[in-house]
From Swiss-Prot:
Keywords: Metal-binding. It comes from the Bacteria. InterPro entries: DUF34/NIF3 (IPR002678), DUF34/NIF3_sf (IPR036069). Pfam families: DUF34_NIF3 (PF01784). GO terms for cellular component: cytoplasm. Belongs to the GTP cyclohydrolase I type 2/NIF3 family. GO terms for molecular function: metal ion binding. This is GTP cyclohydrolase 1 type 2 homolog. Homohexamer. A divalent metal cation 1 binds at H65, D103, E224. A divalent metal cation 2 binds at H66, H220, E224. It comes from Pseudomonas aeruginosa (strain ATCC 15692 / DSM 22644 / CIP 104116 / JCM 14847 / LMG 12228 / 1C / PRS 101 / PAO1).
Length: 252
C-alpha cells in the first residue's frame, strides 16, 4: 500500500503537535522526495550511514530525531551537508525530522519510551507548569543500589554507562534522554536519588557528588533510539505501510 507524502507529514505533525513547540531546528518535512510513500526507514540521526542504508532498503522517507538546518549552523551546502542532501535528492527520498516534539510526546516520546525500556514508573514532568519541560520524574518499582542500577541500564541499552555512585539506594529518579546534563541541579532540587541522561560534563560530576545523588550518563544515542522507533511504528500501523528502524551505532 502507498499513501501520499503530504498525508504522512500532516499526520506526524498533528500527532506530535509540532507547530506548538519552539525548537532549534525546523520540525517536520525538511527535504521533499517522491510524492508517494510505501516504506519508512527510521533512525536517530540523519547521518550518511543511515541515508546509505535507506537507499539500500529502497526507502521513500527517512524519519529521524536529529535532522538538519540547526539554529546557528553554517547554512552553506558544502562538504558533509552537500553529500547528505545529494544522497536524498538523487534518490528522491524525503527527510522527516522531529526534535523536541519527539522528546515531549506522552506516548512515543523519547523520555516515555526510555522509561518503558528501563521499567520506570512515570510521575510526571520535572516542571509541571512548563510546556517545554522535557525532564521526567518517577520511581523504580523496587529500590536498587547504584551499581546494580547501572548494570540494569547496561543490559537494557546495550552500552556501559558512566556512574557517579552516591552509595545510597535509588528509588526516586529523574531522567532525560540525550544531552540534558544541564538539568541536574533542577533534578537535585526535586529531591531525587538519581538523575539519568545521555551525556556528562565535567561539572555534572561535582554537582552529583556534592549533593549526594547518583548520576548516570547512559549515552546520547543509546537513550534516544526508542522514540523514533515508536513514532515509525505508529505511522506504519496508521497507514499500513512498511517501517524499518536502522540503528547506526554511536558510542557517544
Amino acid at each position: 500500500m502507498a499513501i501520499a507524502l503530504s498525508t504522512l507529514v500532516e499526520e506526524a505533525d498533528r500527532y506530535l503537535d509540532a507547530a506548538r513547540i519552539q525548537d532549534y531546528c525546523p520540525n517536520g518535512l525538511q527535504v521533499e522526495g517522491r510524492p508517494q510513500v510505501r516504506r519508512i526507514v527510521s533512525g536517530v540521526t540523519a547521518s550518511q550511514a543511515l541515508l546509505d542504508a535507506a537507499v539500500e532498503a529502497d526507502a521513500d522517507v527517512v524519519l529521524v530525531h536529529h535532522g538538519y538546518f540547526w539554529k546557528g549552523e553554517n547554512p552553506c551546502v558544502v562538504g558533509m551537508k552537500q553529500r547528505r542532501l545529494k544522497t536524498l535528492l538523487n534518490n528522491d527520498i524525503s527527510l522527516l525530522a522531529y526534535h523536541l516534539p519527539l522528546d515531549l510526546h506522552p506516548e512515543v516520546g523519547n523520555n516515555v519510551q526510555l522509561a518503558r525500556q528501563l521499567g520506570f514508573e512515570v510521575e510526571g514532568p520535572l516542571e509541571p507548569g512548563n510546556p517545554r519541560s522535557i525532564v521526567l520524574l518517577g520511581s523504580l518499582a523496587e529500590p536498587m543500589q547504584p551499581a546494580d542500577f547501572a548494570r540494569h541500564v547496561r543490559d537494557a541499552l546495550g552500552r556501559e554507562p558512566l556512574l557517579v555512585d552516591a552509595g545510597q539506594p535509588i528509588r526516586r529518579i529523574a531522567w532525560c534522554t540525550g544531552g540534558a546534563q544541564g538539568y541536574i541541579d533542577q533534578a537535585i532540587a526535586a529531591g531525587v536519588d538519581a538523575y539519568l541522561t545521555g551525556e556528562v560534563s565535567e561539572q555534572t560530576v561535582h554537582s552529583a557528588r556534592e549533593n549526594g545523588i547518583s548520576f548516570i550518563a547512559a549515552g546520547h544515542h543509546a537513550t534516544e533510539r526508542y522514540g523514533v522507533q515508536a513514532l515509525g511504528d505508529y505511522l506504519g500501523k496508521r497507514f499500513a505501510i512498511e517501517h524499518l528502524f536502522i540503528d547506526c551505532p554511536n558510542p557517544a
